[in-house]
A protein has these predicted regions:
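Glycine-biased, low-complexity coil/linker segments
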Residues: 15-17
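Bacterial N-terminal signal peptides
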Residues: 23-31
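Non-catalytic, surface beta->alpha helical segment in thiol-disulfide oxidoreductase systems
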Residues: 540-544, 550-571
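Conserved redox-active cysteine motifs that mediate thiol-disulfide chemistry
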Residues: 466-483, 500
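Short pre-active-site segment immediately N-terminal to redox-active cysteine/selenocysteine motifs
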Residues: 460-462, 466-470, 502, 541
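Short, internal strand/loop/helix patches
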Residues: 353-354, 510-550
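Oxidative protein folding and maturation machinery
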Residues: 144-459
Length: 571
């Protein structure tokens, strides 16, 4: 290190002897070391955070009231709007439809998977925090296109303070870090974000955030967590974007632009108590973004089975034994003879599902320097286990999910994780086993609308694509499917492209469809009809797709159609 006396403000030495010079050199090194230590100090735990006032109840499902009024409505007087969100434990979207009276008022008791942030479809209302047991009140003035949020308990406190708090601590960065794919700028930007994070942590630790004065401890916990989540979510999104943008069309990375997740997120380990092992992240305003991107970018060993660990859903038919050479996980329905045959392919190395998940956890902790399998790791593993996006009722699927849940349980120590793991699986089994016994008399308006859409094309394989003109992935998917639509134009296969006419007006939508020769059936729904279907299928993002067999049964959700699958359904 080059020393600069002026930078450390030391006077000139009194003598020129070697002993004196050595003494001053040691003093200079001591001063610089002290400066570096002060500069690099990181707060590992935050005083008074969390406060311990948020009990387990708020991590569980419950009800809340949404009420309010629309005044001075000048646009189309829609009769419903949707409250949407994500169950951050099961990773499933939820949609609750709110009915508007003729005078513009609304009052609805809705169920929530846990306290957290919700969004609003079809109306200009900002995101809102809502706690189970509370009331969220919304007043919307159509003449100025303004919504005011209030409510009871912590719901009212958080929604009152958060807009001002977010503005106070929002980033001053104006350039997106992946702009121009400048690796040096990306890393410098990351360092500035870590500094922002540390400034927020310091303000929380020293209790100097004046906007929190007068708030309950519960509200303070939610608001402080939302502040911590802001820069963390921005860094996760930036790395996600960087990962995709620095790869070629065939998915290969550019070595000159590669940034490893382990080096980019090297700041997590010393801050893990409030970033990685913090259950309150599910209550943060950006909590969903943090958890979703954490799952894909940092903790993807669970999701993608990284580190050369591979696990596939295979049967144990003798003609498929060769496929196990890529798989060292014991199949759930093996017998001793089969076991011996598999060992030949895997050179004697087979482990249980529980051991496999333990290996994944060990790998993540080692890679990112984490001292324990904290809440965030447990949550992302739970998402892996609770991936139930399969519409069949095959016994093998139920058995495999039970095996995966049993294998993951040793990794779960957080009470809220354990609760949701068992509760979601219980509901999954009830729904699967109860499908055949569902009484048609219990059908909803959404069921009736869906049935009417299917009946028009009865006897056909139906691919339903819920899209919007402003959705890039939707448009790209439709363009990619043109060859497939043409290939099956004379077969009993129908492609239905369904949109909300309010969000996708006919003129620009039909122009896109015509200009790009998008064939198929094009259906424009009213906002109320769209809300019925989003509520029925519980989706709040598009594209959302359904593949339906010739008997009217849903066989796949959110899976792009393929010729192989269509041919299978046509047999």
């Amino acid at each position: 290190m080059k020393l600069n006396r002026k930078s450390i403000l030391l006077p000139s030495p009194l003598g020129e002897g070697s002993g004196v010079r050595l003494l001053w050199l040691l003093l200079a090194l001591f001063a610089l070391t002290a400066q570096a230590q002060v500069k690099s100090k990181v707060i590992t735990t935050l005083k008074g955070y969390p406060s311990g006032t948020i009990d387990e109840y708020h991590f569980h499902a419950g009800n809340a009231v949404v009420m309010g009024r629309f005044t001075n409505r000048t646009e189309h007087k829609f009769s419903t709007f949707n409250v949407t969100g994500t169950d951050l434990f099961s990773n499933q979207d939820f949609v609750r439809t709110i009915h508007i009276e003729s005078d513009g008022s609304f009052l609805e008791l809705i169920s929530l998977p846990h306290s957290g942030w919700v969004y609003f479809d079809g109306v200009e209302i900002p995101p809102a925090f809502i706690a189970v047991g509370d009331t969220l009140e919304i007043q919307v003035d159509g003449s100025v296109n303004e919504a005011k949020l209030s409510g009871s308990g912590v719901t009212g406190e958080v929604n009152s303070v958060w807009p001002r708090l977010e503005s106070q601590f929002s980033s001053k960065e104006t350039r997106t870090p992946w702009e121009g794919l400048d690796r040096k700028f990306m890393l410098e930007w990351k360092n500035r974000k870590v500094k922002e994070l540390d400034q927020i942590a310091s303000a929380i630790d020293s209790d100097t955030i004046t906007l929190l004065n007068g708030c309950s401890h519960h509200a303070k916990d939610v608001l402080k967590t939302s502040l911590l989540a802001m820069p963390l979510e921005q860094m996760l999104v930036a790395m996600h974007q960087w990962w995709w943008r620095t790869r070629s069309e065939d998915g290969k990375a550019n070595p000159a632009l590669t940034i490893s997740a382990a080096s980019f997120f090297d700041f997590l380990s010393v801050r893990q108590s409030y970033l990685m092992d913090n259950p309150l992240m599910v209550f943060a305003a950006d909590g969903g973004g943090v958890i979703n991107n954490m799952e894909f970018i940092v903790l993807n060993a669970y999701l993608f089975l990284a580190n050369d660990m591979q696990r596939w859903s295979k049967t144990t038919d003798s003609d498929e034994l060769g496929n196990y050479k890529q798989n060292f996980i014991l199949p759930h329905n093996y017998d001793p003879a089969l076991h011996r045959e598999i060992l030949v392919f895997d050179k004697g190395h087979l482990v249980s599902v529980a051991d496999y998940y333990a290996m994944c956890s060990d790998s993540i902790r080692s890679r990112f320097g984490l001292s324990n399998t904290g809440f965030m790791m447990q949550l992302c593993l739970l998402h892996r286990v609770l991936d139930f996006d399969f519409e069949g009722s095959d016994d093998w699927f139920l058995t495999r999910k039970a095996e995966e849940l049993a294998g993951a349980i040793p990794q779960f120590t957080a009470p809220s994780i354990c609760h949701h793991a068992v509760d979601v699986y219980r509901r999954f089994v009830i729904e699967r086993e109860g499908n055949a016994r569902m009484d048609a008399s219990n059908s909803t308006p959404g069921d009736s609308l869906f049935q009417s859409l299917k009946e028009k094309y009865a006897g056909n394989v139906i691919y339903m694509d819920f899209w919007g003109i402003g959705c890039g992935p939707c448009r790209r998917g439709m363009l990619d499917q043109r060859t497939l639509v043409e290939q099956y134009k004379d077969a009993p296969v129908r492609f239905l492209y369904i949109c909300n006419e309010k969000d996708s007006p006919r003129e620009p939508s039909e122009k896109f469809l015509t200009d790009n020769d998008i064939q198929g059936e094009h259906i424009f729904l009213s906002s109320d009809e769209w809300n019925l279907l989003t509520s029925k299928f519980q989706f709040n993002a598009i594209p959302f797709t359904l593949l339906i067999d010739r008997n009217g049964n849903i066989v796949e959700k959110n899976v792009p159609p393929t010729a192989a699958k269509l041919d299978e359904l046509l047999k």
